[in-house]
């Protein structure tokens, strides 16, 4: 991914963050309401989906989000942040995918 695209996407994201903070000053009451068994079951399902072609961006993002939730539920907050960073990376790649379609 080109640095110009990364900077553009970061700028777009920061604009949306500002808008969200203005619109919803109170973000949330807790990190997740999902039960641990649900996270484990869904994570296993998405890992199977993502283990074979065709690969879909939304499926990859679902797996990354569930990995972040799992780490949070296990109390591994550093790992949770790493997984959330991976979610961000997937979202940037999704943004680039859409932009490439717009240019085609």
What kind of feature is each model-predicted range?
Residues 1-104:
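Flexible "arm" and connector segments at domain edges
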């Amino acid at each position: 991914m080109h640095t110009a695209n990364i900077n553009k996407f970061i700028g777009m994201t920061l604009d949306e963050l500002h808008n969200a903070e203005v619109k919803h000053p109170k973000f949330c009451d807790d990190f997740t309401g999902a039960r641990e068994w649900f996270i484990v079951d869904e994570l296993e399902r998405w890992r199977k989906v993502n283990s074979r072609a065709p690969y879909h961006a939304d499926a990859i993002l679902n797996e990354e989000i569930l990995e972040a939730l799992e780490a949070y539920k296990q109390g591994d907050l550093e790992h949770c942040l790493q997984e959330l960073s991976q979610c961000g990376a997937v979202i940037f790649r999704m943004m680039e995918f859409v932009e490439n379609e717009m240019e085609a």
